[in-house]
Amino acid sequence: MRVCRCEIKCRSSSSCGSLKGETVSAFRSKRKLLLILTTLIIALVLAVYFLRESLPTNVFLWTSSLLTSLKSHMGNSSSAAAVLGVLQTAYEQSQRIAYAIQPQDNQTLISTPLTPASAPAPMLPPTPITSSRNRSEQYVMMIPDQEDVLSSAVEKPQFACDETNSPNYMIYCQGELLHAVMMLNIFKDSKTFVDKPLKRDPEIVAAEFKDQFPGTITSNDREAVREFVNANFNEEGHELEECELVDWQKEPEQLLSIEDPDLRQFALQVNLIWKKLCRTIKKEVVEHPRRHSLIYVPNEFVVPGGRFREFYYWDTYWVIKGLLASGMHQTCKKMILNFHYLVDTIGFIPNGGRVYYLRRSQPPMFIPMIYEYHMATEDDEFLLSMLNSMEKEFSFWKNQRMINVTKNGKSYAVFRYRADTNVPRPESYREDYQTAERVDRQKKRKLWRDIASAAESGWDFSSRWFANRKTMDTIETSDIAPVDLNAIMYWNMKILAHLHGALGNVERRDELNRERSRFVDTFEAVFFDDREGAWFDLNIRTGERDDDAYPSLAVPLFTECYSSLNNHMMVDVLETLQRKGLLQFPGGVPTSLMKGTNQQWDYPNGWAPINHMIIEGLRKSNHPIMQQKAFEIASKWINRNYQVYQKDKKMWEKYDVAKGYVRAAKGGEYENQAGFGWTNGVILDLMVTYSKRVTVIPSERQTPRQPSTSSDAHVVAAAEIADLTLGKLMQRSSLRAISSFLKCHG
């Protein structure tokens, strides 16, 4: 500011330094140029970070030319140089992100130097670049090479698919074409490319790409690569077609039992969405499997929706819960048969229905799916046909995802997520590559493995997996033994034992029950924290429990993973959920309390499966207080879904549950998706479960409601009593803790 005042008041003063002799108008002209440049670069940064799209190359070149010209005009002004330095850094960073550029020691990104020239550079923008490999490469931006992806110096690369499990691996999981398409940012969503079916066999397309692009690929090749993709690939989703659900009913009996008229109508509208989400695989996938990234299954299935065009593993459990509420037993059976087919042909159930998911799974919900179907149908013949597949899936997790940990000097076998890949995920290749730019080369393999492992967890992504609780580059998923995964594996043991017993296989039932009993002791020793009164993830690297508040700590209630002698644990867990602040929000339970991470499995986002497991875990207890709390959370979640549907006429993948105002959620690698399979399943299951009690919030009511009945008054009174009792219970629990402390230290 001092320089500016000096220039205006005393242009001839010696204190004016380097500005002496200049005119006010000349300085104002420079200031205007600086303002224009600042605005342009800010716009570039915003466009790159928020739009996530590549901008026309000439925009960057024009900005570069303006930077060069302005720097030469500014002379020796230190203030201007400092500002220009900041702008230069911001410009280069936005340029790198837009084109996924990794600076090389022997490479300049732009041929025009940014040092003062002997004569002012022209202010006109350069000639726009055209897409041709034969044009002059005056302005070249190199895409980063694949050295870190392909190198075996630290650890041999393990790709999402290769010649051992997918004949089209050179297109969809690795290779020059995949790398170029992702680094050139051809598509806004990385998943778009790897979902596209080929028009010809993969070997031919890969060879032709190498012939057409033999040298180093640069930003000049963007349009040529785009044209190559358009010429050799069909549209994503081309290999799937909508199908008819033969057992769909317009007015399922269970949905008609919902007493609240607005919620009943809402349930029937959600029931309609099943028809829009049904998919079957076209014959061309069977005839030419190598031309598709889609994994073939024989029967129709319900997809999540949006960018998720294929089936997904753990989603299907909650889809089946909703289909059962809609009375669609045959569709449930067919979807289970698809997974039976995958276990028989692949050996496990992958994350989803694409070849790039073949090296990771998702939370093991196959056995619970069969249990839910059998409970609804009592189809013993079908159950018998599923036994071998259930045992094989159970063995996969025991053999591939178990690890020994030490706690208090004793060794325990527990489960963890650990994907069998250590390179960028094909469906998020560009994002993973850029994340790894911030870490040492020696750590990139583990970083990529832990990113894929977080995707295997279903929580992709959450601060729960980050060492610093903030940024993806500190992810350490494979170093964590998750409390919810281990609780689900306990549930698998319990269900498998029960189903064997139902079929008269007493010996196997007893064997599984003994294993389950031992695992309960392991679970309590490894995960339960007496001071906190809840179960928490174990960090294998540090040997310590992570006591940050995540609703996963309530999953053992859902799977009933606790000793019958320790029922007080359930009340302690409810108290912990309350004390940590997870139950205070108007729309349900958020996936964490970590703010500012911009990850979709963090605050303020709530997800259907997490809310469902918490609600069901509390509801299945024998404690009236916990059952009442389950109803309260269910009412919040149902009303938030209902409110957003009235506003958007859509069901969403996730919801903002923390705000008083109503909206779908944000955050993560991709935009919130509509559909949505498991959201629909959970909402229908909960509305049927609480069909006699749950109501729309009065301010949101669409249909006039009849005057309150005595049963309504009873529910209100019960709620008030439960709240009062909860307060007393928490008081007693606190006194008990103090008493215990005094006994130990008195």
Q: Locations of the language-model features?
A:
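Short, low-complexity, Lys/Arg-enriched N-terminal segments of secretory-pathway carbohydrate enzymes
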Residues: 1-30, 76
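N-terminal signal-anchor transmembrane helix specifying type II single-pass membrane topology
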Residues: 16-61
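Ser/Thr/Pro/Gly-rich low-complexity linker/stalk segments immediately outside membranes or between
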Residues: 53-83
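Extended glycan-interaction surfaces of carbohydrate-active proteins
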Residues: 122, 145-310, 334-353, 407-480, ...
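Alpha-helical support elements that line or immediately flank enzyme active sites
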Residues: 312-342, 552-564, 612-624
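Aromatic/His-enriched, Gly/Pro-containing loop or helix-boundary segments
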Residues: 343-386
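Inter-helical turn/loop segments and adjacent helix faces that build the functional surface
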Residues: 373-385, 496-511, 620-628
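Short amphipathic alpha-helical coiled-coil/interface segments
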Residues: 390-393, 509-524, 630, 634-638
